[in-house]
Amino acid sequence: MVWVKKSVAMILFLGIFLMPQTVYAAEDYMDEMMQKLKLDEVDDAMEKNVTQLPDKYTFSDMVQSFVAEGTDGISRDNICDYVFDLFFYEIAAVKPLFIQIISMSILFAFFGKLLVTKSQYVSEMSFFVVYTGIMLLLLQSFQLISEVVESGIGKTTSFMTAFIPTYATTLLLSGNTASAGSFYGLAFGIVYVLELAMKFLFIPGVHIYVLLVLLDHLFEESKLSKFAELFESGIYLALKVGLAVVMGMGVVQSLIAPAKDRLSVSSLYQGFKAVPGVGNSCGAAGELLGGCTIMIKNSMGAAALLVLVILGLEPVLKVLCFHVMYRLASAVLQPFCDKRLAESIAGMGKGCGIYLKIMWNALLLFFLTISMIAASTGFIN
């Protein structure tokens, strides 16, 4: 009977250790996780908001490229070509409007010199007529700029609305439970406050500033310049306060939440390792799984930053082209025409500069939020 028991034990031993088993490598784990994350909503949001995307990249393609090849997986040449093509396209689009403004101003400067010798009253009336026409052109162009800025911020918040839940899920899978909750709340808070600020503070504030600048230069003496400077200072102060608050909250959460997550995950790993017989195997599998999820999480963060750059390029380049053209037109017209015309066009350039600052700060808020949470949770227990 003894030899029968030994034979049965030997058969069981050989059956357990020699039976073919499926073994998953790190790549298999990451492929399986990528399928479970379901990035379709983020891909749809990106396709909806990004026009003329280089090489037809999707968000999931970018994540897979970062996972497989790192930064070498993204073609820098295609992105650079996209930027240059977009920049020169915007220059060609805004050129006719500024040719009209410069032509009207030069013609007024020429005929104004003739009219001033006849009658000062006729000269002033002709200035009001020409200034009204130029002011209408400037307001028309600035309304287009406002729509571009509002649309650009809207596309950014739309993408972030689709990205935040997916990224929070990835944080949760990587063992960063507290960090996932803090990121979810902070990021959606930024989206909500930014939408309200654009609707009730920044867009109306810049509109009032531009109107005050144009009305101020309607008179020979400055009457509304200090009021316009007050609005300009208020907008810049709101941007600085918002950036400081978000950075402060992000830094505090990046210090506390990841430490809490590290403590809880470390305790879990140590508990698995304490199990006799299979503890080390469970601990090794857990570390492999955690490393895969962190790799996917960081790749998603890098892809999101790249998408934010692409989303911000189009509106930023459009506003930048208008800003450069306004400043250039003001510099060209200053030696020939009335000082008030040149100063009013320069004031429009300052309004474009405020819009550039608003868009830069909006992108920077999301950049800092994603970067801080990705860097602070990029550890393997």
Language model regions located:
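Helical hairpin unit composed of two closely spaced alpha helices linked by a short loop
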Residues: N298-K339
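Loop-centered beta-sheet repeat module
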Residues: Y184-G248
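Small-residue-enriched core segments of transmembrane alpha-helices in multipass membrane transport
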Residues: M125-L136, T156-I164, V193-K199, L230-A244, ...
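Membrane interface segments of multi-pass transport proteins and intramembrane proteases
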Residues: V116-Q120, F219-I235, L333-A342
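Hydrophobic alpha-helical transmembrane segments of multi-pass integral membrane proteins
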Residues: I99-F110, V130-L138, I164-G175, I203-L214, ...
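Interfacial loop-to-transmembrane junctions
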Residues: F336-L356
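Extended, low-complexity, charged alpha-helical tracts
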Residues: F159-T166, T170, A331-P335, K339
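Gly/Ser-rich, low-complexity
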Residues: M1-M104, A109-F127, Q143-T156, M160, ...
